[in-house]
């Protein structure tokens, strides 16, 4: 009986402190445990950053400055807008590629319940070869997005949600002890929590499918579903067919289904979507690739407020599936444009927890 009471007390203490406070980066965090990560307004309880990292110091110094009403750089709460890319910024994008690209391959090539169009199956083979062998060419983003929309077209929103959630349970290829849906970067989840504690309104602006983003991030971080911007497909009524939405009446026997590709939310399209959907210039931007460059510059150029852009460098080849060549190229871009580099190798105490390792 005493041992049971002791176990109960320990469990209660663990939940009260938060999982990460009780077991600092000792194992891979589940989604429920990721959701417990909480950084206070003063930022005194960051656990997963090296405190001597210039990027960490720049962020904390900035937030203290712009949230201080006595500072000349004070930013009113309504103007504290922070935008985050997802893949490679908040979650792993190298297992061995983006979450949604790997899910597309599963749907087009391996799903026994689905027969894709011949052209989608053949293009999925091209994408798979690019991911595993030849490298992804610049024109593949748009083509993949169109084919991805095609293989999921006709699904109701609940059906698509179930498919995404199922794929989230698959192992993160190339890593040990990690699922795709759990592969969030612990230090970056802390950043989101810290900014939320300081009354920043946080948006995700990603090249991934908008609905997939909502499902993938749900419950992990304090980001509302309507604050998620991503690649879009048409949403149609199930009996609408080719009828224009101006000429169709949604009726009781209809359901909303997924349709064709609309827009890939990368590069300048990120800026266009921010201007249209947020309606004001961000003051903080976080990303990791050339697809975020326009978003970075839009944030820091001609801003009436003090603004910063942070770019993660994929330079950790021991704890993560990094790429030093890409990291060096992004560091050079940071120096050129005035973005702040974040070294995953040097600035993060851990990425997923010490029990998560690269597969040999």
Regions found by a protein language model. Name each.
Residues 93-96, 101-104, 215-216, 298:
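Short, solvent-exposed loop/turn and secondary-structure capping segments
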Residues 29-50, 64, 162-360:
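C-terminal cap/substrate-recognition subdomain and adjoining C-terminal extension
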Residues 53, 154, 268:
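Electropositive phosphate-/nucleotide-binding environments in soluble metabolic enzymes
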Residues 96-98, 102-182, 186:
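A metal-dependent, Asp-based hydrolase signature
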Residues 11-13, 145, 220-226:
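Solvent-exposed, charged interface segments at domain starts and junctions
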Residues 6-86, 94, 101, 108, ...:
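Non-catalytic pre-domain segments flanking phosphatase-related domains
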Residues 1-5:
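Positively charged n-region of N-terminal signal peptides that target proteins for export
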């Amino acid at each position: 009986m005493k041992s049971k009471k002791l176990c109960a007390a320990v469990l209660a203490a663990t939940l009260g402190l938060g999982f990460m406070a009780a077991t600092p980066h000792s194992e891979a965090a589940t989604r429920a445990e990721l959701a417990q990560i909480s950084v206070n307004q003063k930022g005194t309880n960051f656990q997963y950053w090296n405190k001597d990292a210039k990027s960490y110091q720049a962020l904390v110094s900035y937030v203290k400055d712009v949230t201080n009403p006595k500072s000349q750089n004070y930013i009113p709460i309504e103007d504290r807008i922070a935008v985050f890319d997802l893949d490679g910024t908040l979650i792993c994008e190298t297992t061995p590629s983006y979450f949604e690209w790997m899910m597309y391959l599963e749907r087009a090539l391996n799903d026994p319940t689905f027969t894709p169009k011949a052209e989608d199956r053949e293009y999925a083979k091209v994408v798979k070869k690019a991911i595993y062998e030849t490298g992804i060419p610049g024109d593949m983003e748009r083509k993949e997005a169109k084919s991805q929309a095609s293989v999921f077209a006709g699904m109701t929103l609940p059906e698509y949600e179930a498919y995404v959630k199922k794929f989230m349970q698959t192992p993160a290829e190339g890593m040990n002890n990690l699922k795709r849906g759990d592969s969030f970067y612990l230090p970056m989840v802390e950043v989101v929590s810290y900014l939320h504690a300081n009354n920043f309104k946080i948006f995700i602006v990603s090249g991934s499918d908008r609905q997939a983003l909502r499902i993938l991030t749900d419950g992990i971080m304090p980001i509302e579903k309507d604050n998620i911007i991503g690649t879009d497909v048409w949403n149609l009524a199930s009996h609408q067919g080719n009828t224009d939405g101006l000429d169709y009446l949604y009726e009781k026997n209809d359901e909303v289904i997924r349709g064709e590709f609309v827009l890939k939310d990368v590069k300048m399209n990120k800026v266009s979507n921010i201007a249209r959907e947020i309606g004001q210039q961000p003051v903080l931007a976080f990303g990791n690739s050339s697809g975020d460059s326009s978003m970075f510059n839009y944030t820091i150029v001609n801003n009436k407020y003090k603004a910063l852009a942070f770019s993660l460098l994929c330079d950790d080849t021991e704890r993560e599936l990094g790429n030093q060549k890409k990291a060096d190229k992004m560091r050079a871009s940071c120096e050129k444009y005035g973005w702040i580099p974040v070294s995953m190798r040097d600035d993060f105490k851990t990425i997923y927890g010490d029990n998560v390792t690269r597969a040999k």
